Amino acid sequence: MDKLRLLFSVFCICVFASCGDNNDHVKETPRSVTIILSKQNSSSSYRHFIENIDPTIKINWINAYTTPLSQLTVELEDADGIILTGGVDIHPGLYGNAFDTIRCGTIDSKRDELETTLLDHALESGTPCLGVCRGLQFMNVYMGGSLHPHLPDTLSDIHRGKNGQSTEHEIYVTKALGA
């Protein structure tokens, strides 16, 4: 009888051990995501930040600015996220100051239209969207907000360092959407 219990115990242990999920020999396929940049610039900050979140993820970067609209429409359907990047000034006509372009720097109307399309898609589809610098300003304008056309007239030119180099600067959030 003891031999039978021992044999049964060994049998149960073997059965339970074989039921475990031991797939160490199976390699997982790396996950991939598609991120659309409103306009890729010479800075690698966006890529560096996202790629360091999880280096095992393969990221398919799409530069919306240079992608034909017909192809961009297809790419947007598969996009996992959108980043509205930094860049030139937003046309003041979009926030009610159409005649205030003299105080602005370079304006890119094509980009304003493109980022409107990207935000339309993000809101309709629920695709996550991150705005960085100009991108965040554009999100504000898109949602009905306004801007100061030329910050040095109001504050100081604190967002630029020597020779036009970008610098880190503080931001203050006073109200969130939906708050």
Explain the meaning of each model-derived region.
Residues 2-3, 18-130, 140-148, 152-179:
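N-terminal beta1-alpha1 cap of cysteine-dependent amidohydrolase-like domains
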